Amino acid sequence: MPKHYRPAGKKKEGNAAKYITRTKAVKYLQISLATFRKLCILKGVFPRDPKKKVEGNHKTYYHMKDIAFLAHDPLIEKFREIKVHRKKVKKAFAKKNKDLADRLLNRPPTYKLDRLILERYPTFVDALRDLDDCLTMVHLFAALPAVEGERVQVQRIHNCRRLSHEWQAYISRTHSLRKTFISVKGIYYQAEVQGQKITWLTPHALQQVLTDDVDFNVMLTFLEFYETLLGFINFKLYHSINVNYPPVLDPRLEALASELYALCRYMSSGRVPGNSEPAGLIEDKEGEDNKESSKTDESELRLAQLQHQLPTNEPGALMHLVQESTAADADDADAKECRSLFKNLKFYLSREVPRESLLFIIPAFGGTVSWEGEGAPFDETDEDITHQIVDRPTQSHVFLSREYVQPQWIYDCVNARIILPTEGYIVGRVPPPHLSPFVDNDAEGYIPEYAETIKRLQAAAQSQVLPLPSLGDEDMENSLVEAIIDRSESNEIADKKRKLEMLEKQYHDELRMEYEGKTFSNRTADNQPDVVDKSDTKEADDHMEDSHKQAEKDAADISKTLMSRKQRGLLQAIEINQERKKDKVNLLKKRKKNADSSASAKGR
């Protein structure tokens, strides 16, 4: 049969059928551009970059399947209801119908994003992998001032602050913090939760100024989704360590802006996972049981009022979050090392140091901390304090039983995983350079001087070699014998290699002498010692080195000719990257040399 005839231009194929421009997508969904942006942010739909742009390079393209996916979402209808509601409120105010306007304002249409969390993250690990930007955004808004003109409301700021402190309380309680770094942008943290490395940035505790070149509508849309995501993750993490969520804060500490320590009120609620009501609110039929329950409530309330005064160096007493159960955090190597870094150390924070950051870091590594102000667990006159964190040129009053260090010492100890010497961090002295733990010095090709010092300190701290617990005495003897045998074999291999090098050198010397006209028979007949002029030997070595380099270059050129264009481009990019690293290393070495020379000149 003849093929069915189809007029040209009636059916789209290829990229024209797969992708659609943003303008056409907005018309297809019958929504405004602002609503389209909000819908794409909440649903996780992002623009695409097709190889062949049918409508032109200046257009923004989306996948047609994504737009069809958005068309069936119930959020579109909710956004339309919100738009209609705003029109009704505006019309009621225009007609001066205050009662109708108040009724409309008290009953606005709402929507929830719980369904979107389940759609975008099928498993909990997927949600943890996408938590970096979420934590950075939430911590940013927790430090911003509330501005009604930009729709940054006070309630939203307080919610961000609550979520961030709940996250920090979990990380600190489970000792999951691994790295931290102070930069110009803020303070970087990296934690490991259920095998996933999560990195986020918190701003410095300074007065923030909102600029006019930032679109807060887009940021608030992201924040709306991130608040729901972080609340869901906190809920799952708290229940994973047998803690009910959300925690109940101590009003006294909350009023003193100590929300992180206000979580100690949590255990006073009498809730356990699985119970829907507090233990003190269960009503009994008999009067005697009612009296006993009222006495229990009074004792629990009294304990709740005094609970913040308990010593914070007890296991789990940092936030008083975890019930007495053996299902605590996993005892892996990193957790053990982090838990015992600041063990048996007591810190006191002066008022000029970054208090919230240090209150988060020090307990996460097993230390006990207090601060200057109301609601603190202990005051400055406590004789058990081992370190006082000070960031001022001089210290007026000094306790001889403690050390006064700068805040950088805490961060450097955390990154090095050892207690560093405090001589370089004392009050009034310029501290050592603050090295980033996120940079691999070996891969970069340049190791700073202080990094080498820290490596030597780490090696000294780990110098004690202990037998493995799974090996007995006989196994230890066998392992020692095997090590001695391996050592002897390696020595034999080194001797053979040395002899081969000597023979090869002798062979090259004979070739060079033969090239110059001298023979081996003449040398032996004259009974002259086998001595070669140093200058001739150097020239021969240079010639051999040049020949080796030329051979390597020829082999590299031959291998390049056998590569495809893509492989050659990749190799060229790698070589360019290596050259850039070398130039950067040379620049750093030059700067260090100039700095050392200038410092020595000043010392004179």
UniProtKB/Swiss-Prot annotation:
PANTHER family hit by this protein: PESCADILLO - RELATED (PTHR12221), PESCADILLO HOMOLOG (PTHR12221:SF6)
Disordered: annotated segments: 275-299, 518-557, 574-604
SUPFAM superfamilies in UniProt: BRCT domain
Protein species of origin: Oryza sativa subsp. japonica
Biased composition (Basic and acidic residues): 282-299, 531-557, 577-586
GO terms, molecular function: mRNA binding; ribonucleoprotein complex binding; RNA binding
Name recorded for this polypeptide: Pescadillo homolog
Subcellular location as annotated: Nucleus, Nucleolus; Nucleus, Nucleoplasm
Record family assignment: Belongs to the pescadillo family.
Gene: PES
Record PROSITE patterns: BRCT
Phylogenetic lineage: Eukaryota, Viridiplantae, Streptophyta, Embryophyta, Tracheophyta
HAMAP family per UniProt: Pescadillo
Pfam family, one: Pescadillo_N
